């Protein structure tokens, strides 16, 4: 199967090249990047050497579609929407890593991504409704039948997977959910950003986007669908001075305060027992981002505070893999009829 990587020179695109070049089921048919078009790949990315040393090409529908079956859109928010319908009309399947199709309502996207909405005059509410939210562990069947997949954000991935078992079965109350997340600097992308300079963020920890972070509404939308009722929650992201990795600590109120840590661990383990990339750790073993670095694995741990009937769930992912491109490849595998984890590392080279 031929895959076009559109936006190949950002962090998401670079991860896609690295993953697909090792996967016998796929052939990279196009590498797109407007700022670097006309340059040879190996000259710019010698650390991900490609035998045929292809040129990076200008991004256009004709260039993308001439040899591709699937397009991976690794583009900034808003830009993907300028290509998606045209690529679908050409018969390609589309996996979008941006936020353009994560919301079932275009109006909701315009509200949350107002800056992008002012630039990109979209009229594709039908595609927003059609797009499948690409969280493989939750939506595998729908993904297998879809032609447009909207990959989740990194923070939503780290929060929704640990929350889903407890929301879907009514184990926790719908009110009072708090998500405290930490992300490495690569989550900010590859474009220069003063806040991500080593001298600015090194040896420090800071919160950002309190209350109004864009991923809050995305988490709430999907959590509400899982639980069957409207959910509002608190989400606070933090920047930590590591290159990659994400850690989320999630707090909720148990409907049955008599449940123990072992009870909640068994429930979590049973829910994900058929997914090789999800590991539920023993009670009192708490995961580190270092344990999942450069893998598509997600590690989960749960603890109950029986003094107050609260549950604490921990999750760690590599934000560039399970939180981004690794998840896109999971979706590609499902759409193509392959094993979900085909070509994805589930163990890292510790330390």
UniProtKB/Swiss-Prot annotation:
Gene Ontology, cellular component aspect: cytoplasm
A molecular-function term among this protein's GO annotations: NADP+ binding
Major location (coarse): cytoplasm
Cysteine pairs bridged by disulfides in the record: none
EC number annotated for this UniProt entry: 1.2.1.38
CDD domains the record matches: AGPR_1_C, AGPR_1_N
Entry keywords, A to Z: Amino-acid biosynthesis, Arginine biosynthesis, Cytoplasm, NADP, Oxidoreductase
Residues in coiled coil: none
GO biological process: L-arginine biosynthetic process
One Pfam family per UniProt: Semialdhyde_dh
SMART domains attached to this UniProt entry: Semialdhyde_dh (SM00859)
Keyword hit for Cytoplasm: yes
Catalytic residues (UniProt): 154
InterPro entries: AGPR_AS, AGPR_type-1, NAD(P)-bd_dom_sf, NAGSA_dehydrogenase, Semialdehyde_DH_NAD-bd
Location within or outside the cell: Cytoplasm
Pathway: Amino-acid biosynthesis; L-arginine biosynthesis; N(2)-acetyl-L-ornithine from L-glutamate: step 3/4
PROSITE patterns reported for this sequence: ARGC (PS01224)
Catalyses which reaction(s): N-acetyl-L-glutamate 5-semialdehyde + phosphate + NADP(+) = N-acetyl-L-glutamyl 5-phosphate + NADPH + H(+)
Family under the similarity heading: Belongs to the NAGSA dehydrogenase family. Type 1 subfamily.
Protein task: Catalyzes the NADPH-dependent reduction of N-acetyl-5-glutamyl phosphate to yield N-acetyl-L-glutamate 5-semialdehyde.
Database matches in PANTHER family: N-ACETYL-GAMMA-GLUTAMYL-PHOSPHATE REDUCTASE, CHLOROPLASTIC-RELATED, N-ACETYL-GAMMA-GLUTAMYL-PHOSPHATE REDUCTASE, CHLOROPLASTIC-RELATED-RELATED
Name under which the protein is recorded: N-acetyl-gamma-glutamyl-phosphate reductase
UniProt organism field: Prochlorococcus marinus (strain MIT 9301)
